[in-house]
Swiss-Prot record:
Belongs to the peptidase M48B family. Binds 1 zinc ion per subunit. Pfam families: Peptidase_M48. The lineage of its organism: Bacteria, Pseudomonadati, Pseudomonadota, Betaproteobacteria, Burkholderiales. The gene is htpX. It is found in: Cell inner membrane. Its EC number is 3.4.24.-. This is Protease HtpX homolog.
Length: 283
């Protein structure tokens, strides 16, 4: 129920952003049009955003015959988590990363890069996939997928506000300074919304994944290894679609600046410390 409320709040916040941009573009008429567009986008995001994200990453579905070891691992973990078997995808990227998407546990998918299968041990990979299934179990996947697709749409509308100007409520050309401010602040607002819902759920998914796999130390080791590789190997699809970065188990975006300041992921050191605190102490 709580995650359903978070989804409703997310949709309402993004709808308000759409209307603000519409007001800059075309006054009251623009605001009304933006409301209609936002409602349509909310509907589209609910039903199709998972397919859209998987297509962005050119993810290929696999099964027990094409990827028996990986598919079997996901099936075993899903059974332990008492979840329906999700669809399983592989992404042909060297950068190690993974994510989950879908409307609900009955319509979920998990995806991993070929790079993560190469660099992690089987034990570490189990920890990562258990983390993704924890997102499914906690019903985070709808929130993250909707916020990714809607953030991209907001950035696009903000660029329209800058390059095509607009008209105020009196029919005169809109203030170009307002257009510039919208272009700068709307994507920032979308990022802040993503941050608000993303950081806390990563900690929860770490904890839940450790409980599913029964091995918090393996997930901690995986996070450290993914971070080391991520610093030198860019995830090309995420660089093209940065709004999807918050879906990943580790922030895949290169560079610092605003991207680092407004990261949707908690510090890896903090995540590792929380996981290691779950490891039973030997007497």
């Amino acid at each position: 129920m709580f995650n359903l409320m978070k989804t409703a709040v997310l949709m309402a916040a993004i709808t308000a952003l759409f209307m603000a941009i519409g007001s800059v573009l075309g006054g009251q008429q623009g605001m009304a049009i933006a409301l209609v567009v936002a409602l349509g986008m909310n509907f589209f995001s609910y039903w199709f955003s998972d397919k859209m994200v998987l297509k962005m990453y050119n993810a290929q579905e696999v099964d027990a015959s094409s990827a028996p070891q990986f598919y079997g691992m996901v099936r075993e973990l899903a059974a332990k988590a008492e979840l329906p078997m999700p669809k399983v995808y592989l992404i042909n990227e060297d950068a190690p990363n993974a994510f989950a998407t879908g409307r609900n546990p009955q319509n979920a998918a998990v995806a991993a890069t070929t790079g993560i299968l190469r660099v992690l041990s089987e034990r570490e990979l189990r920890g990562v996939m258990a983390h993704e299934l924890a997102h499914v179990k906690h019903r985070d996947i709808l929130i993250s997928t909707i916020s990714a697709t809607m953030a991209g749409a907001i950035s696009m509308l903000a660029n329209f506000a800058m390059f095509f100007g607009g008209r105020g409520s009196d029919g005169r050309p809109a203030n170009p300074i307002a257009g510039i401010l919208v272009m700068l602040l709307a994507p920032l607002a979308a990022s802040l919304i993503q941050m608000a819902i993303s950081r806390a759920r990563e900690f929860e998914a770490d904890r839940g994944g450790a409980e599913i796999s029964g091995d918090p130390q393996a997930l901690a080791s995986a996070l450290q290894k993914i971070q080391r590789y991520a610093q030198g190997i860019p995830l090309e699809a995420a660089e093209r679609h940065p709004e999807t970065a918050q879906m990943m188990i580790m922030n895949p975006l290169s560079g610092g600046g605003l991207r680092g300041l407004f990261s949707t992921h908690p510090a890896t050191e903090e995540r590792v410390a929380k996981l290691m605190a779950m490891v039973p102490q030997r007497v």
